[in-house]
Amino acid sequence: MKIIKFTESGNKSKRCFIAMSFSPEATEIRDAIKEVLYKLGFIPILIDEVHYESDITINDALIAEIKKCKFMVADFTEHKYGVYFEAGYALGLKRPVIYTCKKDDFSKTHFDTNHYPHIIYTNADELKEKLKNKIEAWIL
């Protein structure tokens, strides 16, 4: 069994876990979220960009990273099941979750989450502005 050490977690952390689609179509949105986080002094964590030893499963890594984060940005565009799981896990840990979704996809989001306030956006620039404002008001 591999034990993952936590150096910082929760309120003291500068880490933000990003849960979203890894599709090529999501690259612009991924980059927009990362840009905002960096500008506000946070470290964006995307599970597909973190390297782990071979004996750590992606699920163990994912859970460890969510535990270490101060908050999460969960983008429900493309409706990936993993995003729903990751956001729910973060909520269970009492981590703030900022919900985002592209306007054209929002009507397809699951009823268990679509009643939470979402940042609805039409393009990356709009997302950057709204996300920056939300983090400044809600996290900083």
Where are these regions (language model features)?
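Conserved catalytic or regulatory cores that recognize and/or transform ribose-phosphate-containing ligands
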Residues: 1-140
